[in-house]
């Protein structure tokens, strides 16, 4: 990208090298750690290829929560001269956007299935998959739909900071898309190469599993945060989460009526501060009644996005939670997903807190620490 003007903000050195690497590989992985600016690198690389006429349209596939807050925002920042559209909403609306003249079209994973035929017929010659671990299983409908819209000459860049983080076999589905010759034809053969059976239901990684996975997931570039010396101390990203139907119902009701009835209990909002606090409680998943009882709400959308963040991180995750009962709800849900979790709230003694923080900093577990904001 030596002759490139780098529109928008000035890139960091690792972003320049990442963008250059992507432009040199029709199919490639970007494994830069979370918070290193992978999105900007991919946008600049795409814009460069568009300038050269090597690609005509770009399809960005990413989580629903970052379609607007990350990708559309970053495209306006780093490629403001390009036409951008988000394919979300009804099937007809998505189809119209796919057929539009937008140079960048952003769509979520499951949205691809809705308009897969339209995408396959269109002229998307570069596909960028953000948080690519969602395509680790080659048997899923999601994986098969992505494979369907790819042509032999399609550019494909798959990005994630946590490749094969759960198991070496996770590399198979990713490699089959980018580097199919780097893995066996069948999953079972690959599994035998990277794992060995301990018992009927237990498999463990072989000693050479890391090397096998490394060779399969090529060509690839990776920068860790400590290698990116010019990064700011803190990097902020936003994610959008829709309220669940249950939350939305009572959120609107409380806004309109100022008094909400849930399961026979009255929850009063006698002033603006209390009103706002109740709305925040609904959003967080647990509302306190006037009698002190906690009433739980469906927070599957909120939890899904939190789980995405945890899965995408190669480091431990500290989560600040505004309300005590919401912490318990999150801890129980994380536990069901086998994610080791510790809690810091008002019921935890100072001595116990010290032990929890020490474990979080030095031990493999817990992976997640949930803390009340005012406690921390």
Tell what function each PLM region has:
Residues 91-104, 109-123:
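Conserved helix/coil segment N-terminal to the catalytic DExD/H
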Residues 67-89:
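Conserved helix-turn-beta segment of the N-terminal RecA-like "Helicase ATP-binding" lobe
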Residues 101-104, 125, 154-157, 365-368:
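Loop/turn-to-beta-strand initiation segments
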Residues 35, 110, 133-136, 163:
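Catalytic acidic motif of RecA-like/P-loop NTPases
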Residues 2, 9, 23-24, 35-37, ...:
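Conserved Helicase C-terminal RecA-like lobe
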Residues 1-31:
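Conserved pre-motif I regulatory segment
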Residues 81-84, 126, 134, 143-228:
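Conserved P-loop NTPase motor "coupling/switch" region that bridges the ATPase
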